[in-house]
Amino acid sequence: MNLPFDDWLPQQRWYGGRSREFSSATPDVVVTLRDDLDLVLLTVNYAEGRPEHYQILVRWDAAPIDEYSVVARIGSDTEHGERTGYDALYDPAAAHFLMTLIDSSAQVGDIRFAKEPEVTLPLQAAPRVSSAEQSNTSVIFDQDAILKVFRRITPGINPDIELNRVLARAGNPHVARLLGSFETTLDREPYALGMVTEFAANSAEGWDMALTSTRDLFAEGDLYADEVGGDFAGESHRLGEAVASVHSTLAAELGTSQVPFPLDTVLERLQSVADAVPELQPHAQSIEERYRKLADQEITVHRVHGDLHLGQVLRTTEGWLLIDFEGEPGQPLDERRRPDSPMRDVAGMLRSYEYAAYQRLIERGGDAQHDKQLAARAREWVNRNVSSFCDGYAAASGTDPRDHAELLAAYELDKAVYEVGYEARYRPSWLPIPMKSILRILGV
């Protein structure tokens, strides 16, 4: 196979190695699924550090529909005569064939396809590639199912498949039901390649709903949050119930344990970010002192979502769904599967509420960031929705996150420190959002 992967791969939006110096992309594993369709595993080497593996499905010669003909074209291969390779996920026939392999629980070479028990796959549905920006590629089959194909693959048990399977088989109503998956083995390690879940038709992302609410609030400067038509507090209460339900199921199905507060982990992140971001350095000592208050505390842990925020929840006509159980981006797989306090997920949601409110002030620019009335409205909106979320969580679980104030604050600080590092590197204009939150939590 002689496709120009070196040129093509770094241009893809799901490519995750942009912060590293790219060296080469070599097709080390090629599995022929049928005569015109290959599953290719690339080994991607960098100037420094460990190589990574990426998955590409290559459709030969038959071009995708016109809408995707440019973006899907990989290039020409002259080793086997003149032929053109395309990203197969943009070809409806190839995407449909993948679904049939999952439906039949087929094995092709070392690729194992599996359908979940007692499910029906929509084999007659028309596939289309999702336009959402993400690190994987998703193909939506009408209003019935979504096939997520992992691009950068890592060894070990995939937490997204694992936790979706546990929650679906337990009958939890707050996840999209897992329908099937496919995987392979490299160097005696399992590698998840993709998964199929029910498609959340007619759903709205929690982030978009929250932004609509804050927009309505700021447009009505003389009204309080509970007086504006787009008040989000009721949805926040129901969202708290949904998160608590998922936590309860994970704890019941996979068990809980008592472990020390992860002091070393949070201190390592704090030191790393403080070294890189001067704005954080004056507050690093105070943050460390807050962490060390929990040094001798045992906390209850179980499997959690791990990267929960308003962009990871969908509101359907039936209620809230939690999606994307892959854990914190960039972390090793064993860390993403490690049990953690449910306060980690709660803190992620509380941080997301602050972003939804204060992002609006930054977007308005000029004096908006310093407008005391708008700032008061933003704080009011955050407090109202945080309270409603915690009320809902407490109602469903019997445990109020606010009763664990020191632990919750520590996880909020850890999340905000992570955000400081991210914003300083990628969105400097947003850096005030996590910095102000850190000052608020510290009482400065």
Curated annotation (Swiss-Prot):
Its EC number is 2.7.1.175. Catalyzes the ATP-dependent phosphorylation of maltose to maltose 1-phosphate. Is involved in a branched alpha-glucan biosynthetic pathway from trehalose, together with TreS, GlgE and GlgB. One of its GO terms (molecular function) is ATP binding. Monomer. Keywords: ATP-binding, Carbohydrate metabolism, Glycogen biosynthesis, Glycogen metabolism, Kinase, Nucleotide-binding, Transferase. One of its GO terms (biological process) is glycogen biosynthetic process. The lineage of its organism: Bacteria, Bacillati, Actinomycetota, Actinomycetes, Mycobacteriales. It comes from Mycobacterium sp. (strain KMS). Pathway: Glycan biosynthesis; glycogen biosynthesis. The gene is mak. It catalyses: D-maltose + ATP = alpha-maltose 1-phosphate + ADP + H(+). This is Maltokinase. It holds the Pfam family APH.
